[in-house]
Amino acid sequence: MTSSVRIVGDPSRFAEQLVSSIAEHVESRVREALEAARKIVERAYEESASKLESELRRALREAEEQVQAYTAKREVELRKRLAEIRAKAVEEIMSVALQRLREYVGLEAYKEFIKRLLDSALETASRRSRRVIVHPARPDQAIVAELAPRVAAEKGIEVEVGEAVEGAGGFTVRAVEAGLTLDYRLEVILAPALEEARARVLEVLNQ
């Protein structure tokens, strides 16, 4: 027995309604699919954007850390260089001051100062050795060569004037037999005053 569907009314209108219903259903499904696809795309975009932002922040942090490290390193290098420059400037200033000491006090007063140093040095050295050698600092070579024999004669001792040594002024005395060397160069005997002067110069340079 064959079943049949009876269509009531206009068959063509029924067909239109059926097609319209199917079309609406299909359109609805398409809209749902498109909406789902849009959400997937948006989520992917948001995740990508978030990841990109995270990467950018990380890169920025690394760059800032590198800049800070470089800046700190450069600052240390600059401070070290500045300290070296200041130290060099101090030594140059002190060297000039020592070299000009004769001008400050006058030649005769300076020679009297060297003579007193020779008197003390030769007195000490001659007690230790019969052979005493005086080595003048280069700037005072002529003064020491002139005064040493005179001071030695006054004390009744013999003295040799040896080769010049480096120094801002003054001399060294060697008691040969005792293996003893006495240092009477200006930078040694004036050390306390020079340290005070160095501190003052550094204070001025740091202002």
From Swiss-Prot:
Keywords: ATP synthesis, Cell membrane, Hydrogen ion transport, Ion transport, Membrane, Transport. It comes from the Archaea. Coiled coil: none annotated. It is a peripheral membrane protein. Gene3D superfamilies: ATP synthase, E subunit, C-terminal (3.30.2320.30). One of its GO terms (molecular function) is proton-transporting ATP synthase activity, rotational mechanism. The keyword Iron does not apply. Its main location: membrane. It is found in: Cell membrane. One of its GO terms (biological process) is proton motive force-driven plasma membrane ATP synthesis. Disulfide bonds: none annotated. Has multiple subunits with at least A(3), B(3), C, D, E, F, H, I and proteolipid K(x). Component of the A-type ATP synthase that produces ATP from ADP in the presence of a proton gradient across the membrane. This is A-type ATP synthase subunit E. It comes from Hyperthermus butylicus (strain DSM 5456 / JCM 9403 / PLM1-5). The lineage of its organism: Archaea, Thermoproteota, Thermoprotei, Desulfurococcales, Pyrodictiaceae. The gene is atpE.
